[in-house]
Swiss-Prot record:
Subcellular location: Membrane
Gene: Tvp23b
Keyword annotations from UniProtKB, A to Z: Acetylation, Membrane, Transmembrane, Transmembrane helix
Residues modified to N-acetylmethionine: 1
Disulfide bonds: none
Family: Belongs to the TVP23 family.
Protein name as catalogued: Golgi apparatus membrane protein TVP23 homolog B
């Protein structure tokens, strides 16, 4: 199931490809894992809502901070260990070998002719929307707390950025592969944008 990269302390598997998924496997819009989809959004959205309304709901900063940290911790565990595997077939984790060396493993479910399971497009959209949108919100909250001198909230906001950013980074690595693939993908994208811009300028002139 896993192919190891000898030049990196990570392990990757064959990754989902959009074209192969479209041609080889039927896509359905219905939600196949409603409970997982619910909890994928519940903890992270609840943490954001509590952060925004905590000063209105409670005068105790400690109570609000503990509630937000608990919600963020539950979200990190649920997204890392449950919802990613069920909703999009991705998983990342760490293990230490016999020599005490740490290895990061990034897994993606392989598409095989024997696999009759369908991919839920609705679940995929829910997963990636929640995975990307919430860390962006926490980054905005971090700048807001910094510039408004709400120093006491910085620790809470930074924890939100770190925990949800870690899941985002891990699943992006699962999706695009190793660092080399991620770098080449970014380079290829920038090259295409540069070429397209130059082509457009040439046609205009």
């Amino acid at each position: 199931m896993l192919s190891q990269d000898s030049n990196d302390d990570t392990e990757d598997v064959s990754l989902f490809d959009a074209e192969e998924e479209t041609t080889n496997r039927p896509r359905k819009s219905k939600i196949r894992h409603p409970v997982a989809s619910f909890f994928h959004l519940f903890f992270r959205v609840s943490a954001v809502v509590v952060y925004l309304l905590c000063e209105l709901l409670s005068s105790s900063f400690i109570a609000c901070m503990v509630t937000i940290i608990l919600l963020l911790s539950c979200d990190f565990w649920a997204v890392k260990n449950v919802t990613g595997r069920l909703m999009v077939g991705l998983r990342w984790w760490n293990h230490i070998d016999e020599d005490g060396k740490s290895h990061w493993v990034f897994e993606s479910r392989k598409s095989t002719p024997q696999d009759n399971k369908t991919i839920s497009e609705a679940e995929s959209r829910i997963f990636w929307l929640g995975l990307i949108a919430c860390p962006v919100l926490w980054v905005i909250f971090a700048f807001s707390a910094l510039f408004s001198f709400r120093v006491k909230w910085l620790a809470v906001v930074i924890m939100g950025v770190v925990l949800q950013g870690a899941n985002l980074y891990g699943y992006i690595r699962c999706k695009v592969g190793s660092k080399k693939n991620l770098t080449s993908m970014a380079t290829s994208y920038l090259g295409k944008q540069f070429l397209r811009q130059n082509t457009g300028d040439g046609q205009t002139s």
